[in-house]
Design a protein with these regions (language model features):
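Helix-enriched interaction subdomains in cytosolic or periplasmic regions
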Residues: 1-47
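Serine-esterase "nucleophile elbow" of acetyl-processing enzymes
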Residues: 27-113
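Conserved SGNH/GDSL esterase-like catalytic core that processes O-acyl groups on lipids
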Residues: 85-181
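A Trp-anchored, charged/polar loop motif used as the substrate-binding/catalytic surface
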Residues: 119-140, 188-200, 263-264, 268
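Hydrophobic, aromatic-enriched interface-forming segments
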Residues: 187-239
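Substrate-gating cap/lid alpha-helix
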Residues: 223-282
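Histidine-centered active-site loop/cap adjacent to the catalytic His
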Residues: 299-334
């Protein structure tokens, strides 16, 4: 098990997160002031009255204290930062949480972003803070904050760097030192900074923290399929070219290799959320939600690294199956 960060590391992460949070909030204060001035100067600003009502889940009896309203019904407000699993064309986890469970979601997720980019000075947290303002303006607070990241730190054009050539006896396959550096150091450090930064932002701006949900990935099959098949200017494939580069051509072998590295990623997250200072963070294990069996994996996976949408797109609703795992956790929150 990789060691948890020491006190000095934790202190430096907290200091960096606090500074980043203060810089973001200073930009938000400037934006709020400009918006307030614009509305003051507006000849007829539109006033919108919203009524927040506790809405029971389908089939449940409404509590005695619930008011009756059709003004602003929602299962709750969510904030999200992340990668393509939160920002995929037409369907993704967030659209399923919206459509299937009734959440209102403010997202700063951007497909293709590595986790270390998300938390950088040019990352997603400024837009995250703007989304938080929008929720607060409605008189609400976030039910939870969702974080999806790390896949783009592993997959992509540099993926082959993680693999030793098949002929490099006695160490063909995953280069453990490189894997440790990428997953257990770079990605884990970026996750720590992301979580501490989000907590710092919320504490400084709203006086409290909120539940944070992170997730691992499921087991993919590196079959060479990109977005809409890939090729040309279309994104992908993300995995098979790296295996081809290192002369691994047996899809059964490479599928098992992906199981190994996905397990490594999930173990990192499982350990990370148990570190001191993260009592508000929950990890969701998505492994074995979708299939990686050669018999039916294409029913569940649209391409190498993204689930199927089902319906008119064919196959199973992989996004829906994953969103159901999120809902199982969200349903336990107040």
């Amino acid at each position: 098990m990789p060691p948890s960060p020491g006190n000095n590391d934790q202190s430096s992460i907290q200091q960096a997160a606090d500074q980043h949070a203060e810089e973001i909030l200073e930009r938000r204060r400037e934006s709020r002031a400009r918006r307030a001035a614009a509305l003051t100067a507006h000849p007829q600003p539109l006033s919108i009255k919203t009524e927040l009502t506790q809405v029971p889940l389908a089939g449940a009896a409404p509590p005695a204290s619930a008011s009756v309203s059709t003004t602003a019904q929602t299962a709750g407000y969510l904030l999200a930062v992340g990668d393509s699993w939160f920002d995929y064309p037409i369907h993704d986890i967030l659209t399923r949480l919206d459509d299937n469970y009734g959440y209102n979601i403010e997202s700063s997720a951007h497909r293709g972003d590595p986790i270390e980019t998300m938390v950088s000075q040019v990352g997603q947290l400024d837009k995250f803070a703007r989304g938080m303002d929008k929720i607060v303006a409605l008189g609400a607070t976030p039910k939870a904050i969702l974080v999806s990241g790390g896949g783009d730190d592993i997959a992509g054009k540099e993926f082959g760097m993680l693999i030793n050539n098949i002929d490099l006896i006695p160490v063909p396959g995953w280069n453990d030192q490189v894997i440790a550096g990428v997953i257990d150091t770079r990605i884990a450090t970026a996750y720590r900074l992301m979580i501490v930064s989000i907590n710092s932002l919320c504490q400084k701006d709203l006086g409290r923290t909120f539940p944070i949900i992170v997730h691992g990935y499921d087991y993919p099959v590196p079959d060479g399929r990109g977005f809409l098949g890939g090729g040309g200017l279309l994104p992908g494939p993300w995995l098979k070219p790296g295996f081809d580069e290192k002369l691994f051509s047996d899809i059964n072998v490479t599928t098992q290799m992906m199981t190994t590295v996905i397990d490594r990623f999930n173990i990192m997250l499982q350990n990370l959320v148990q570190e001191p200072g993260f009592p508000n963070v929950t990890y969701i294990d998505l492994r074995k939600t979708l299939s990686n069996s050669q018999n039916n994996y294409k029913d569940w996976w649209a391409n190498e690294i993204h689930p199927n949408a089902g319906g008119i797109f064919g196959g199973q609703d992989g996004w829906g199956a994953i969103a159901a795992k999120f809902q199982a956790v969200l349903a336990t929150l107040p």
